[in-house]
């Protein structure tokens, strides 16, 4: 059965023609089961979506453990019969909760990508501007930007700093701070200058090297901006849910962890 409206509707019609009470049991397999469960639930069936591990460990008492779609279907049916009275009923999630959970899944994926891209940029800078990522300790901004990343977008090679006089770099750094909205410090400018002049890049200062660093920075900045946007959207979605104040009052829960807890656990008010 393909996941089209016509074929799933035909499946619902065939199930309705069966004698006796019919319950539909399916494994929770990513998002693959979602359209089937949603349509059959809407058609009035008792639908139960069970954890795949519960079914996998059920009835493994055969010496031969072949795995085919037919055998899996029989195994699911037997599991459903044995747990008929305790099968959890599938209830479609509210739109807000569904979108919050989806946003969090995407947030997790982008976080992994961001870590990979950040490590890649640091590795490149180790050959062009060693320890450039250690020049600043400022936390990321709300839009996802980080000071050290913005800095190396302009001063991508240590020669971009030590190739200037101390006075010229200080003036250029002050102009850069003003452009990007960072606070300027004369002492910090001198520290950066001393650090850059105490390093050397094994990668030559060429257009190719600049291209490599700029592309790595561009990808990282794009991913960081996407993460910041997702974080803001998760905060907005979570704040519209009734359990939000309860979660946010928990010890150690902040604006980042709170929406994540709600996305994973759901309405915590059901626990007593």
Where are these regions (language model features)?
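A detector of single, family-specific signature residues
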Residues: 1-272
